[in-house]
Design a protein with these regions (language model features):
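Extended, low-complexity, turn-rich repeat/linker tracts enriched in Gly/Pro/Ser/Thr and Asp/Glu
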Residues: 166-174
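Aromatic (Trp/Tyr/Phe) and Gly/Pro-enriched flexible surface segments
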Residues: 18-161, 176-179, 183-186
């Protein structure tokens, strides 16, 4: 899924049906933070790029991320530290489109297997939302607890406007992969 162009709220200006399109901060998807996080050596020790929608910056190391520069956007990109192992997921990333960028949202399987200590496979769906993620992720139980969805608004939007393009899976069934359970069709 690609979210392109801009994300805007259409706010009511008066009791009459007049509307004004206003950009949500960073809604054009042209500015990204590139977090460069080294995963644990026991799973390869590779440095991974974990992206966030916020003022352009590069952050090196496994620092916990907090929304920067007034950005209201959270993503499903995360850093996890489970049983002392640092692992990342990037399923939302910038993709060039025209003169700027769009947000590409992918769904993928993420696996971590370590010498009988950890054996996790999860379905990681790309998503963006207003809010934050509480890092680091420390397990797969109650993932909604790690999300703080929503941000305060002082206006009353009546609509959300955005461009998108989607490529659907060719699988007949959806799958469920939550971490410690068996992967099943749903």
């Amino acid at each position: 899924l690609l979210m392109t162009g801009f994300v805007a709220f259409i706010s009511s200006l008066s009791l009459m049906a007049q509307h004004k399109v206003e950009m949500v901060p960073f809604g054009d998807m042209d500015q990204w933070v590139d977090r460069q996080i080294k995963e644990s050596g026991i799973i390869g020790g590779n440095t991974k790029n974990v992206y966030e929608i916020a003022p352009t910056a590069v952050i090196q190391g496994d620092q916990v991320y907090k929304n920067m520069g007034g950005s209201p956007w959270g993503t499903s990109n995360v850093m996890a530290k489970v049983a002392g192992i640092t692992k990342t997921n990037t399923s939302v990333f910038p993709e060039k489109r025209g003169e700027g960028y769009c947000a590409r949202l992918d769904t993928r399987m993420e696996s971590v297997k370590v010498l009988g200590l950890v054996n996790i496979t999860v379905l990681a769906a790309g998503s963006i939302f207003t809010g934050t993620v509480h890092e680091p992720i420390k397990g797969t139980k109650n993932p909604q607890k790690m999300l703080q969805c929503g941000v305060p608004f002082t206006k009353k939007p009546v609509a959300l406007q955005f461009d998108y393009k989607v490529k659907m899976s060719d699988r007949e069934n959806r799958i469920r992969a939550t971490g410690f359970s068996k992967i099943t069709d749903v």
